[in-house]
Design a protein with these regions (language model features):
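Auxiliary Fe-S-binding modules of radical SAM enzymes
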Residues: 17, 22-118
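Canonical radical SAM enzyme core domain
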Residues: 4-18
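Short, catalytically relevant binding-site loops at active-site mouths
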Residues: 3-7, 37-40
Length: 118
C-alpha cells in the first residue's frame, strides 16, 4: 500500500519502495502499488482523527518509477479512481496515461512536466 495509515506523508514513498524491495527479495514476480483510499469507514475515521492522508499522484509516480526502474519483475500501479490523487486537471490525463504505459511496457517514461502545477 502507498501511504498506509500512521505513516507520515513524507515517508510514504520510502516505505513503498522498501515494500517493493521486500517483495522482490522474497521472489515475487509481480508487485502492485495500491494507493490507500478513504471510503471504507475505517480510513475515513483515521483521516478525521488526523492519522491518515491519501497519497498524491506524485508519490505514486515516484514509487512506480522506482519499482519499474529496478527491472526485477513486474510492478503495476492501481489506476482505479486515480483522479482523486491529482491536484491538477491540466496534466492529469497525461500523467494517468504515463502510468498506464508503465503498467503495459514496464519501462520508465519521461515524467510529465506541467506549467500549471510544477
Amino acid at each position: 500500500l502507498l501511504q498506509p495509515p500512521f505513516i507520515p506523508s513524507e515517508e510514504a514513498v520510502e516505505w513503498a519502495n522498501r515494500s517493493v524491495d521486500f517483495s522482490k527479495d522474497c521472489g515475487a514476480k509481480v508487485t502492485s502499488l495500491i494507493p490507500t483510499r478513504t471510503g471504507n469507514g475505517a480510513m475515513d475515521r483515521l483521516a478525521t482523527a488526523g492519522q491518515f492522508t491519501e497519497p498524491t499522484l506524485d508519490q505514486l509516480e515516484d514509487a512506480m518509477d522506482y519499482g519499474v526502474g529496478l527491472a526485477r519483475g513486474r510492478v503495476f500501479a492501481d489506476l482505479w479512481d486515480l483522479g482523486r490523487f491529482s491536484s491538477c486537471e491540466t496534466c492529469f490525463p497525461q500523467r494517468k496515461a504515463r502510468l498506464g504505459k508503465q503498467n503495459d511496457t514496464q519501462q520508465v517514461p519521461i515524467r510529465i512536466t506541467c506549467p500549471s502545477c510544477r
